[in-house]
Amino acid sequence: MASRGVNKVILVGNLGQDPEVRYMPNGGAVANITLATSESWRDKATGEQKEKTEWHRVVLFGKLAEVAGEYLRKGSQVYIEGSLQTRKWQDQSGQDRYTTEIVVNVGGTMQMLGGRQGGGAPAGQSAGGQGGWGQPQQPQGGNQFSGGQQQSRPAQNSAPATSNEPPMDFDDDIPF
């Protein structure tokens, strides 16, 4: 079995603000988003409806970062698959600080959910690692996140791979 462990995070939530996109010296895009997830329950003692919101820092790399910057906006609902990472940094006074983030890179997935929101992408469009190419995508639709069906690839992901990305693995069984 997996003797090295598993580090996989799956979130469905709404953006708390517009994505912040930056470019690394090598030209690769990096997008930072803040994702809110909420759970609600009824208090057994009072019968009162309660809700708790958790905020998550998410970092997207490469084509996913570009797609996020172009199509996601504050309030957009999104499905994220990534890994949990904690990084260490120093503040201006030299104190060590730690930040835990969900990192979405080559093996991760970002899928836009819901309808158009002020010029966003059509409902259900997604982008996966390698710009949506070479890996199974999540099925379209509300809350169905398992299964083997593949969807057509969105037009914004048809740009050629940059030199620092591995070659694309095309599926010979194209559904269109």
UniProtKB/Swiss-Prot annotation:
SUPFAM superfamilies: Nucleic acid-binding proteins. Residues 115-134 have a biased composition (Gly residues). Residues 135-152 have a biased composition (Low complexity). GO terms for cellular component: nucleoid. GO terms for biological process: DNA recombination; DNA repair; DNA replication. CDD domains: SSB_OBF (cd04496). Residues 153-165 have a biased composition (Polar residues). The keyword Protein biosynthesis does not apply. Residues 113-176 are annotated as: Disordered. Residues 6-111 form the SSB domain. Plays an important role in DNA replication, recombination and repair. Binds to ssDNA and to an array of partner proteins to recruit them to their sites of action during DNA metabolism. This is Single-stranded DNA-binding protein. It comes from Serratia marcescens. The lineage of its organism: Bacteria, Pseudomonadati, Pseudomonadota, Gammaproteobacteria, Enterobacterales.
